[in-house]
Amino acid sequence: MSVTLHTTHGDLKVELFCEAVPKTAENFIALCAAGAYNDTPFHRLIPGFMIQGGDISLGPAANSQGTTPMLPFDDIPKGGTSIYHPSALNQEIHLPALRHNTRGILSMASRPVKNQTAPGSQGATGPTINGSQFFITFAAAPHLDGSSTVFGKVLNLTAEDEGGDVLSKLEKANVKTDKKGKVVQPKENEETEYETLRINRVTIHANPFAT
C-alpha cells in the first residue's frame, strides 16, 4: 500500500512494507489516519544522509485548540510516541531483505530504552524502541542496518516533478541547522531567507488495517 506525504516542497508518495513489518506499518498508517503528522516539521536535515520528521509532539495534535486527532491516549509525550503507548513498539528488523541500501528508504528513528516500566517502553524486548519519528535516506546508510526498522520507500525517484524531484528539493532546502542537523524553523510571519520544512498533511491511498 502507499501514502502521500504532502510537504512544503511537494508530494512524496511512499510504499509501505505492511506484510514484512506489520506493527510498524500499522503504527505509521494509524498516525497518518488520525492526522497526527499534519503540520509537523521535518526537524532534522543532513544533506547526503537523511531528513527526519514525525515528532507528533511538535504539531497541533499536541496543542490543539480545535479538532484533536483520534489517538488511543490523551497526552502526547515529548518526542512523540507510537499508537501502542504506553506499551512499546519494538523493532522489526529484517536482514538482509530490508536494508538502508539506497536513496529514498523510509525507516524508523528509534530511541533507547532507559526504563522498561516507563510509559512507552513497557514490554520492550530490545535496547531500542520506535515511536512516531521516522527518516528518509538521501543515500545508502548501511551502518543503520540492524539498528533501525526499514518500513517503506519513496516511489518515482527517477521521475521529474514526483518523488525524486521533491526529495532533492528537501535535501537542498535553504535551512538553518545546528551541528547535529537540527532544523531551526522560521517563526510565523518572520521575514527570513530560510525555508520551512513541514509535512502539511497525509493522504492514505489504501488502508489494509481499516475495519
Curated annotation (Swiss-Prot):
GO cellular component, one term: catalytic step 2 spliceosome
Keywords: Isomerase, Rotamase
Top-rank lineage group of the source organism: Eukaryota
GO biological process: protein folding
SUPFAM superfamilies given in the database record: Cyclophilin-like
First-level EC class: isomerase
Keyword Phosphoprotein recorded: no
Catalytic activity, as annotated: [protein]-peptidylproline (omega=180) = [protein]-peptidylproline (omega=0)
Enzyme nomenclature, EC number: 5.2.1.8
Statement: the UniProt record of this protein carries the keyword Isomerase: yes
Gene3D superfamilies, per the entry: Cyclophilin-like
Gene Ontology molecular-function annotations: peptidyl-prolyl cis-trans isomerase activity
InterPro entries for this protein: Cyclophilin-like_dom_sf, Cyclophilin-type_PPIase, Cyclophilin-type_PPIase_CS, Cyclophilin-type_PPIase_dom, Cyclophilin_A-like
Domain PPIase cyclophilin-type: from-to ranges: 1-204
UniProt similarity note: Belongs to the cyclophilin-type PPIase family. PPIL3 subfamily.
Function: PPIases accelerate the folding of proteins. It catalyzes the cis-trans isomerization of proline imidic peptide bonds in oligopeptides.
Entry protein name: Peptidyl-prolyl cis-trans isomerase-like 3
Lineage: Eukaryota, Fungi, Dikarya, Ascomycota, Pezizomycotina
Gene: cyp10
